[in-house]
């Protein structure tokens, strides 16, 4: 019989709509200003921590809607953002640097919806407010470090083999040249070094020289490593900042986008994200006197560095250990109430420190603080020129064999100790980064964007509904119900997807898909009217109308989906957000227009004697 659906299709349609409605509902309940407390490096908060939080809030007379321990994290909800900020300050001072106290917006979803993991959509920066940074990795410094490593490695190999050389000089494109006493030594060096350094192209040059340059594959690998490692380290630093639902992702070859929703202290964010501080541990060369050091007369294996007081210190160039091996660091005070930083190393770092210190007991070891800072100058491309600043913050005699844990002193004040411990805990950047773009969106503007976005959606929906009802009567009402169902399904699916974030371009995508859904219904209704004018019966006209319009609707939507997939693949940020909502909307509009409206039409007219249609 024409225009009848089997029962399972109706059941499927009802189930899909109900599920979509359930997962769309949390978006109506809004969010509470909240403070989220988590342990550093994955340590779970305990019942004792919960009691401490509750006690602190009571003592400071800060009213909380609720304070709960959930999945190893404490979530305290408040009525206003002012109360939220007061609570964060109070809890940070009490809990110290063992916990991350993050500002958050916690969904006010009822328990029965939370039980089925129904959560509201994640809002993008333009809707929620916050700060956006576009950062550029300083590839010149990253590859320069690799060049230095190659120089040290080749020098070490030549000394190990006993091949004499006179000078080592840096060359263009991060290469290097080594000068030997004669051609025999040069040829021997080439034969020895080539199989040991597959990532270098080593060639003979005139004047008893060899030249070594990195292969294109090695340079590409180094660039990729610098960006990826910086992304990982920035994510760690964002966690230390205490930001909920941040975005840290790559953009292009050497740029990184960082978005921090709800952040209010932008100066602090820039300070932590852009900081390039790390530590180097080196042995002090005690064979050079102060006068020679001040005059810069030092051996080739040493160099002069300054203390914070401006005193010269001669350090060996060989770095015993860098901040890369630091797994944890905390700030505290020593027995003299002076600030110190307690450092824990990974197993490899612990072995290096242990093996070195056992052979050098009684010798002085210096802690060198290394940082890149903006010089205030610009290069030819208008980018800030960074300068490397190094200062000796601590010199101590090695009194015993050190292991995985030790402490450093000589730090000016407790704030600096906390800052240094935070940076070391998060990890040192592989290469300096520059903030090339910064945008701040206030919470008020975010709310305004939400309001305008909702108004745009509702206006588009109302105009479409009026148009459909005016032109297609009862079939227009059926199409209207499909439009509403389409919007519910889009919101429900967006809420279900863990990585989906709704932004202003995403709202534009939703408005666009509502237009696409209207277009599909227009095609179907016009085809039915055409079949009726050709003398078909009502049942035949409905059947032929849907069948005839299907190919046009399907082809149009498939081409749109192809474009959306391409946008998602090559786009970033806002473009991806637009692609996601448009793709979801196209799929749901096909479902509601072809299956949803047909189900309603079949229920109303299927298998019945109908002589006239309201269309």
UniProtKB/Swiss-Prot annotation:
The keyword Acyltransferase does not apply. It is found in: Cell inner membrane. Keywords: Cell inner membrane, Cell membrane, Membrane, Protein transport, Translocation, Transmembrane, Transmembrane helix, Transport. It comes from the Bacteria. Pfam families: Sec_GG, SecD-TM1, SecD_1st, SecD_SecF_C, SecDF_P1_head. GO terms for molecular function: protein-transporting ATPase activity. InterPro entries: SecD, SecD-TM, SecD/SecF_arch_bac, SecD/SecF_CS, SecD_1st, SecD_SecF_C, SecD_SecF_C_bact, SecDF_P1_head. It is a multi-pass membrane protein. Gene3D superfamilies: 3.30.1360.200, 3.30.70.260, 3.30.70.3400, Multidrug efflux transporter AcrB transmembrane domain (1.20.1640.10). The keyword Disulfide bond does not apply. The chain crosses the membrane at residues 10-30, 452-472, 477-497, 504-524, 546-568, 585-605. GO terms for cellular component: plasma membrane. GO terms for biological process: intracellular protein transmembrane transport; protein targeting; protein transport by the Sec complex. Forms a complex with SecF. Part of the essential Sec protein translocation apparatus which comprises SecA, SecYEG and auxiliary proteins SecDF-YajC and YidC. Part of the Sec protein translocase complex. Interacts with the SecYEG preprotein conducting channel. SecDF uses the proton motive force (PMF) to complete protein translocation after the ATP-dependent function of SecA. Belongs to the SecD/SecF family. SecD subfamily. This is Protein translocase subunit SecD. It comes from Salmonella choleraesuis (strain SC-B67).
């Amino acid at each position: 019989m024409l225009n009848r659906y089997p029962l399972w299709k109706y059941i499927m349609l009802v189930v899909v709509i109900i599920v979509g409605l359930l997962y769309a509902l949390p978006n109506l309940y809004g969010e509470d200003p909240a403070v989220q407390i988590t342990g550093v490096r994955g340590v779970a908060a305990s019942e004792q921590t919960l009691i401490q939080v509750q006690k602190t809030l009571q003592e400071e007379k800060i009213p909380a809607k609720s304070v709960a321990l959930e999945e190893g994290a404490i979530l305290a909800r408040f009525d206003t953002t002012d109360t939220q900020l007061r609570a964060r300050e109070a809890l940070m001072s009490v809990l110290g640097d063992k916990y991350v106290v993050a500002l958050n917006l916690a969904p006010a979803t009822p328990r029965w919806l939370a039980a089925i993991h129904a959560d509201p959509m994640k809002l993008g920066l333009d809707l929620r407010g916050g700060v956006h940074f576009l950062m550029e990795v300083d590839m010149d410094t990253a590859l320069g470090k690799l060049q230095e490593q190659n120089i040290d490695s080749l020098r070490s190999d030549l000394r190990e083999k006993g091949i004499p050389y006179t000078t080592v000089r840096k060359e263009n494109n991060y290469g290097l040249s080594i000068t030997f006493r004669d051609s025999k030594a040069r040829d021997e060096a080439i034969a020895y070094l080539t199989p040991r350094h597959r990532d270098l192209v080593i060639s003979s040059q005139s004047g008893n020289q060899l030249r070594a340059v990195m292969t294109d594959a090695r340079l590409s690998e180094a660039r990729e490593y610098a960006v990826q490692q910086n992304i990982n380290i920035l994510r760690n630093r964002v966690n230390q900042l205490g930001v909920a639902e941040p975005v840290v992702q790559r953009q292009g070859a050497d740029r990184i986008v960082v978005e921090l929703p709800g952040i209010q202290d932008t100066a602090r964010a820039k300070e932590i994200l852009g900081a390039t501080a790390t530590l180097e541990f080196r042995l002090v060369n005690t064979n050079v006197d102060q006068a020679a050091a001040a005059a810069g007369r030092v051996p080739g294996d040493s160099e002069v560095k300054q203390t914070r007081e401006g005193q010269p210190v001669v350090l060996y160039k060989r770095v015993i250990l860098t901040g890369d091996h630091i797994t944890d660091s905390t700030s505290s005070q020593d027995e003299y109430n002076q600030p110190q930083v307690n450092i824990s190393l990974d197993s490899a770092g612990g072995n290096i420190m242990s093996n070195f210190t056992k052979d050098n007991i009684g010798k002085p070891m210096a802690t060198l603080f290394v940082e890149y800072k903006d010089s205030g100058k610009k290069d030819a491309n208008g980018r800030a020129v960074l300068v490397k600043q190094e200062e000796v913050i601590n010199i101590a005699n090695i009194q015993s064999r050190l292991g995985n844990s030790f402490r450093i002193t000589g730090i000016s004040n407790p704030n600096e100790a906390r800052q240094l411990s935070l940076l070391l805990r998060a990890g040192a950047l592989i290469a300096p980064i520059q903030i090339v773009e910064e945008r701040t969106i206030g919470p008020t503007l975010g709310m305004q964007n939400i309001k305008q976005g909702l108004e745009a959606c509702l206006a588009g929906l109302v105009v479409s509904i009026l148009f459909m009802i005016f032109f297609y009567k009862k079939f227009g009402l059926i199409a209207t119900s499909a439009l509403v169902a389409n919007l519910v399904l889009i919101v429900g699916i967006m809420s279900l997807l863990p990585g989906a974030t709704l932004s202003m371009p995403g709202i534009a995508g939703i408005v666009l898909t509502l237009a696409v859904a209207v277009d599909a219904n227009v095609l179907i209704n016009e085809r039915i009217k055409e079949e009726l004018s050709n003398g078909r019966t009502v049942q035949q006209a409905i059947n032929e109308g849907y069948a005839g319009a299907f190919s046009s609707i399907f082809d149009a939507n498939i081409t749109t989906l192809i474009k959306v997939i391409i946008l998602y693949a090559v786009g970033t940020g806002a473009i991806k957000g637009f692609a996601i909502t448009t793709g979801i909307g196209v799929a749901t509009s096909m479902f509601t227009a072809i299956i949803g409206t047909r189900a309603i039409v079949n229920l109303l007219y299927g298998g019945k004697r109908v002589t006239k249609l309201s269309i």
